[in-house]
């Protein structure tokens, strides 16, 4: 899954990038409203973390434009504006959650997970497809109730496939889930991750849809 961090404080931006990358998210970063607008128009994000005090525009105005342009993905406001009126304004403009600075990193991570679950239509952090159980909160996978060790990118790929089990998933969407815009993945890197996943959960569980992407089988014997 890919996140967009819109924060002009470089030190905080780097801290958020490091913490969320360790959680298994691919992250893009923007320090201005202009940069954020350009990235929003070029990639699919599971969630946006938005600071309000940007150097070239107010974050609320930016969010208002996104909502008017029908950008419906979750937005978490992260700001030093901590008055009740500020929170009400942010939520009324279209934010899905509001967290004031200073904040506990563990709380931010929990809110990110909750917003992504809500957007995916599930309040339960555990999702089961046949003999595969995915725990989004703890980033753990069970196969026949036994733990399977995955890398962060493997977990991100499997998460997308499990959430869309039985349906085809375009390879470009999987690329966006695991790579930031400035990454330079090799042309077959996704295939390598898919190969490794097949070794861990069963080679027939993930089907290749030639010229399109992949599909996780559901409700059938592999």
Curated annotation (Swiss-Prot):
| DNA bind region | 124-218
Q: Which residues carry this modification: 4-aspartylphosphate?
A: 51
User: Which keywords has UniProt assigned to this entry?
Assistant: Cytoplasm, DNA-binding, Phosphoprotein, Repressor, Transcription, Transcription regulation, Two-component regulatory system, Virulence
Species annotation: Pectobacterium parmentieri
A Pfam family recorded for this sequence: Response_reg
Name of the protein in its database record: Transcriptional regulatory protein PmrA
Highest classification ranks of the organism: Bacteria, Pseudomonadati, Pseudomonadota, Gammaproteobacteria, Enterobacterales
Q: Which SUPFAM superfamilies match?
A: CheY-like
UniProt's post-translational modification comment states:
Phosphorylated by PmrB.
Query: Which gene produces this protein?
Result: pmrA
Biological processes annotated in GO: regulation of DNA-templated transcription
Concerning InterPro entries, the annotation shows: CheY-like_superfamily, OmpR/PhoB-type_DNA-bd, Sig_transdc_resp-reg_receiver, WalR-like, WH-like_DNA-bd_sf
